[in-house]
Structures are given as C-alpha cells and as structure tokens.
Amino acid sequence: MSTKPEKPIWMSQEDYDRQYGSITGDESSTVSKKDSKVTANAPGDGNGSLPVLQSSSILTSKVSDLPIEAESGFKIQKRRHERYDQEERLRKQRAQKLREEQLKRHEIEMTANRSINVDQIVREHYNERTIIANRAKRNLSPIIKLRNFNNAIKYMLIDKYTKPGDVVLELGCGKGGDLRKYGAAGISQFIGIDISNASIQEAHKRYRSMRNLDYQVVLITGDCFGESLGVAVEPFPDCRFPCDIVSTQFCLHYAFETEEKARRALLNVAKSLKIGGHFFGTIPDSEFIRYKLNKFPKEVEKPSWGNSIYKVTFENNSYQKNDYEFTSPYGQMYTYWLEDAIDNVPEYVVPFETLRSLADEYGLELVSQMPFNKFFVQEIPKWIERFSPKMREGLQRSDGRYGVEGDEKEAASYFYTMFAFRKVKQYIEPESVKPN
C-alpha cells in the first residue's frame, strides 16, 4: 500500500511527483475534464464542488437570447454594478493610501528596532471596514460567491461539532456574522469577543434586529490572544464557563505573531473548554503557503502571489534563504489583500504541526483538519436540501455545480483549511510560568 499523502488539488502532478516520487499503475490514471461527463449521481469533482442535475442552462444563456424584459434587467444590473465599482474604487484608493501610510510608519519603527503593533493595525482596519460596510450593496460585492462559500463552510463546521443547548465562545467574533448559524444549531448561550469595538457595536445591532433567536448573547470588546480572557469577561457575570465550544474563524493567524501570543491563545481556549468540548476554526493553509513560496528562487526579495481577488506578499525572502524552511514557527509575517474585504493587513503563517503540538500541550486532541475544498465536497451532500434556495443559488457555479470557481477558488477553496480539536484532559498551569 502506498504511503504517499493524498495529492492536494492545488498541487500539480509534476510537483507532486518531484516531491514524493513518480507514480505508476492505477495511481497515475487521470481523466481529462474536457473529455469527462458529469452525471447527477457523481459524488463531486474534488475541487470543492458538487455536480447537480442539468440546471445550469438558464445561468449560461446569453443576454441576446433572453426576452426584452430580461435583457433590460441585465442592463439595470450592469449599471448598478458600474456605480458600485466606481464607489468601491474611490473607497479603496482612500483605504489603500491610509494603509500605505500606516505600513510605512511601521516599517520605520522596525528599522528603529521597535516592534510593529499589529493589534492596532488589525483593530483600525476592522473598525474602518465596519464603518464603510453597506449591507444594502452586499449582493453587488465582487466576492459575493466567495462569501457564500465561506459561510457554507462555517454552517457545516458549526453543525458538525455543536449540539443543542451548548454554550459557545467565539474568539474574534467580528460583527456577529455567525449568530444565525448558531441559532440554527439550537445553542443556549453565545459569548462573542473581538478586539474591534466597532465590530462589537455592529454585532449588537445585528443581534437586536434578528428575530427568533432564543438563546442568550453576550458581546464583549477584548483581546482574545494577547491577554487572559478573564480580563475581558470579568465584568460579564452572565457568561457560563466552561463552554462546550470555542470557535475562531479567520483570525487565529494573528496569534502567531509570537510564541507568547500563540500560547496565550491556546491557554485561553483550554481554560474555557469543558472536557469533551470542541475547539474548531478556519486558518490559512500553511502547506499551500509553503507550496507557493517554494516556487520562488532565492533572488526574489519579496515573494508575492495572487490574482484579481486576493494577494499575499512576504516582506523578505528569509524562507528561501533558509533552504526553503521558515526560520521560526512564529512571526512569519505577510500582508494580505482581499477584494472588497481586507486591505493589506499583516497576518502570520500558522504552521499546522506547530498548532497541533501546542494544542496537545494544552490537552487538546486533533479530530480533523482538511482544506476547504475537501471539507466542502465531503459535507455538501448533507446540505443541499438543508440550505435555503437563496443559499443554494449563491453557491451555484456557472457550470451548475456547487462551490467556487475562477479566481475565487484559489482565494477560498485552496488558501484556507478547517480544523477541529477535542479537549481530552485538564491543563494544569505551572505556578512558576503563570502569566500575569
């Protein structure tokens, strides 16, 4: 039996053969997408999508083939997109100028041997994003399909590990975008903590506007990774600790600025969870990042890649110079840009084996870890009928399958991975190393 790992969908066959040796026999057989036919009974294409019945004919119709009324609708929609694009260009120009000024200041600070205050950058960024967000224009966003895909992933994660009556702690809860998802799971209490006060205020507004949420919600402004959670939650006696669930969605990478912060994050998780409780979340896939970095020669000073949707830029080539290995599992900073969402914010690589090792120290056992595309293909058959018609429409690609396509595929399906741990033992904090 072959001991080779499964080839990630984002890795070319040539690169896989180079790294693990060539394959022969049945392992080497492939099917050309051009020649293969999709049937309604096929389980999926392995690309983070699921085939469906022939329902894409309407989606692929040309404007010229449609009735006059429909053609007029397309023109109106096009004008709305043009107005939105113009407003977005102006907004992004202002935001980019501000971000460049901030990064320039931080570069000067680094030159003076002072550390970057990434927490402040992140706080300012998400405060700004909250202020400029206009939910009425959400459906016109150029990354609406990516947002739908990420929401589907979170629905699946929450449903897989959350039980009715659970108490949930979400670290980095943002504007409360998952409140309705947890309502569907039937939880009894939601505790959300975020470093951005503007995001917490927006989460309060969102919660007050929602109906039929029959669970208690506690929303708190606080630093989830830089200090003990006790500092943030002490003024809120209604919080019911320990929790059944701790969740971190698209934010744990900020904790990997230093080993101290990463350990504080895992300690906060471990101290907040019951034995048997689950810690799950979503993070950038360190193996995909390595794969991309490995393609750059040592002479390239600032490795960078991306497309029209996202861009990743490392500030130096220390990875390449260190024989294509990170010099440390912590502090491996890059800036991340995502169209209509994130404006060149500093983030940190989360080497998954480091996360797994830390989690083990704090009594957390790995249950599952999968790239988004693989997790989506595994879970979507259970969700096709559960999702609302609007959600299904939002997930449908131009070929009739479900998932993401084009540039959005790499930005979501390939760049991110899910994980889940279970607390199996109580962590005893040594007296001599207890943080203040």
Swiss-Prot record:
UniProt region (Disordered), positions on chain: 1-50
Outcome when changing residue 182 to A: Still viable; normal growth
Effect of residue 367 to A: Still viable; normal growth
Consequence the record notes for mutating residue 176 to A: Still viable; normal growth
Result after altering residue 254 to A: Non viable; no growth
Membrane-traversing stretches: none
GO cellular component terms given for this protein: cytosol; nucleus
Domain annotation mRNA cap 0 methyltransferase: ranges: 141-424
Subcellular localization(s) per the UniProt record: Nucleus
InterPro entries reported in the protein's UniProt record: mRNA_G-N7_MeTrfase_dom, mRNA_G-N7_MeTrfase_euk, RG7MT1, SAM-dependent_MTases_sf
Effect of residue 363 to A: Still viable; normal growth
Result for mutant: residue 172 to A: Still viable; normal growth
Recorded consequence of changing residue 206 to K: Still viable; little change in enzyme activity
Effect noted on mutating residue 194 to N: Lethal; no enzyme activity
Chemical reaction(s) catalysed: a 5'-end (5'-triphosphoguanosine)-ribonucleoside in mRNA + S-adenosyl-L-methionine = a 5'-end (N(7)-methyl 5'-triphosphoguanosine)-ribonucleoside in mRNA + S-adenosyl-L-homocysteine
GO molecular function annotations of the record: mRNA 5'-cap (guanine-N7-)-methyltransferase activity; RNA binding
Keywords: Methyltransferase, mRNA capping, mRNA processing, Nucleus, RNA-binding, S-adenosyl-L-methionine, Transferase
Keyword rRNA-binding among UniProt keywords: no
Outcome when changing residue 194 to E: Still viable; activity near to wild-type
Family: Belongs to the class I-like SAM-binding methyltransferase superfamily. mRNA cap 0 methyltransferase family.
PANTHER family registered for this protein in UniProt: MRNA CAP GUANINE-N7 METHYLTRANSFERASE, MRNA GUANINE-7- METHYLTRANSFERASE
Physiological role: Responsible for methylating the 5'-cap structure of mRNAs.
Protein name in UniProt: mRNA cap guanine-N(7) methyltransferase
Lineage: Eukaryota, Fungi, Dikarya, Ascomycota, Saccharomycotina
Chain's gene name: ABD1
